[in-house]
Amino acid sequence: MKVIIATDGSSFSLAAAQEACRLFGRMKETEFTIVAVFEDVPIAATEPFALPPEYYQEMTDAARNQAQHNADQTAEALGSGCPDANVAIEVLSGKPASQIVDLAERIGAQTIVVGSHGRGFWGRLLGSVSNSVVNHAPCSVLVVRSEPAGEE
């Protein structure tokens, strides 16, 4: 079974990884893919407000590094509960929901596991990554609701 765990580095994502471990970790054939997606910093080219190109590259590099850190942290959390898990990491650039869905199609995932921030009415109105993944995924999606300490 191929399971994608999407992470943004939040405690909600870590809770999703723990739930994925609990549900799928005992199956020897489970292949976990942890995905973290970062968005490139858009270039503002209007003078006199334009910044040097190096600034945008530095910001994109910082976003990529943070996404890698988030994925590594999630892999560590998954490994603590499922020490024998087969885990791969993908760090992708683009819109998070579409990259997660594209990855699921590309690897033939059977399940995507995402955390939910539970933003209530306004969050639902404005949309969210988990909502978009649920509506566009080619496979089952498990949305893990939790209220970790210190976050609401």
Name what the model sees in each region.
Residues 33-35, 88-92, 142:
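General small-molecule cofactor/ligand-binding pocket signal
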Residues 53-69:
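A short acidic, glycine-rich active-site loop
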Residues 22, 76-112, 148-152:
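Structural beta-alpha unit
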Residues 111-132, 150-152:
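Glycine-rich, Arg-bearing micro-motifs that act as flexible, cationic patches
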Residues 1-18, 135-152:
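Intrinsically disordered or low-complexity boundary/linker segments at protein termini
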Residues 2-55:
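Small/aliphatic-rich secondary-structure junction motif
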Residues 36, 115-117, 145-146:
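Short secondary-structure boundary segments
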